[in-house]
């Protein structure tokens, strides 16, 4: 059973949506996840978009910003500007559909026994929420990946990876569930300076 502790992000403390659910998992579970993670990451690292900078060794918020900054500087040097849109998928880790994840993993060609294990690992997860000395009744988590788990971020990256198919005429960068879509435009910007 996972114990979920709500961790405050920002906003009003009396608003439940301003908290992230962090799962406290058993040490045995985490050790097992580390073993699976090493193998799974080795098999999938070449599949994950180079535009995803979250939860990927050698990539970070810094590499994400560096790629974007270099693109912007190049545009400015050529007399252009860059239009961008920033998005953040609300509750992306909590709402991740297990059915869609299993389908995507199947498309990657994973062995059926491994897929059964992943399905077993994510399905019927019993959780309870603990806040100070108060604790909820146990409930079954029907979607999402456990935040605080070792495999959760990799599952999320594999889940969101095909978003790259949506951007044929623009650039994009991801940092986990934060998406930046951008494009160089050739508008005259001399009047701005």
Where are these regions (language model features)?
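Short, intrinsically disordered, charge-balanced linker/junction segments flanking boundaries
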Residues: 187-193
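Conserved pre-catalytic core of RNA-dependent polymerases
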Residues: 1-146, 183-184
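Conserved helix-loop-beta segment at the catalytic/binding core of cyclic-nucleotide signaling proteins
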Residues: 167-173
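Substrate-binding beta-hairpin/strand module that engages nucleic acids
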Residues: 173, 180-181
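Short, conserved phosphate/pyrophosphate- and ester-handling motifs at nucleotide-, phospho-/glycolipid
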Residues: 148, 152
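Hydrophobic "anchor" residues on beta-strands that sit immediately upstream
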Residues: 84, 173-174
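Active-site flanking residues adjacent to catalytic metal/cofactor-binding acidic residues
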Residues: 87, 176-177
